[in-house]
């Protein structure tokens, strides 16, 4: 099974799976687990600096989370620059890593993460969650540099109702 030999779980290149990602982005948007964010780079930097000044770890403030549907529709029709953010619930994310053992993260420290540039252009943490589910991946082996991505991926899996693979 793979891109060179094919198989039942195929389309293996992310560029060939855009409609699959769109389906799941649309699901999260419909369920209000994700939302359009129209914040500019300057606004995000101002918010970041304000948090640092207050001695807080910088994270997205969530200000676009409560935009009215009508406002979002107008901004999208106007072609306003945007991304799609996943609403991170305030919870502890706990999982068992097959190498490191039990790991726990405080999701409230993360802030809402960007999962797509638009419904058909997913970013890494979203795309791998969908790919793992659609391709029936049971074990995710990753480097230490991706350990911090795991709680984000687990929260996205839970929001989509996907089973959680084993991590190592």
Each model region followed by its residue ranges:
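Short, solvent-exposed turn/loop segments enriched in Gly/Ser/Thr/Pro and often Arg
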Residues: 3, 13-16, 40-41, 167-168
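Conserved short loop/turn motifs at secondary-structure junctions
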Residues: 8-17, 141-143
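Active-site cores that bind ATP or allylic diphosphates and position pyrophosphate for catalysis
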Residues: 27-168
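A glycine-rich helix N-cap at a beta->alpha junction
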Residues: 1-9
């Amino acid at each position: 099974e793979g891109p060179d030999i094919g198989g039942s779980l195929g389309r293996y290149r992310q560029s060939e799976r855009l409609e699959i990602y769109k389906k799941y982005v649309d699901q999260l948007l419909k369920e209000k687990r994700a939302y359009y964010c129209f914040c500019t780079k300057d606004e995000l930097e101002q918010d970041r600096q304000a948090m640092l000044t207050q001695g807080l770890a910088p994270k997205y403030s969530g200000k676009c989370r409560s935009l009215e549907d009508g406002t979002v529709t107008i901004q999208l029709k106007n072609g306003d620059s945007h991304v799609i953010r996943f609403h991170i619930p305030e919870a502890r994310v706990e999982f068992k890593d097959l190498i490191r053992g039990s790991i726990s993260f405080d999701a409230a420290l993360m802030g809402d993460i960007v999962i797509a540039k638009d419904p058909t252009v997913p970013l890494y943490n979203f795309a791998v969650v969908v790919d793992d589910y659609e391709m029936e991946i049971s074990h995710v082996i990753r480097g230490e540099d991706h350990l911090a991505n795991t709680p984000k991926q687990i929260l996205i899996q839970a929001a989509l109702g996907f089973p959680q693979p084993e991590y190592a």
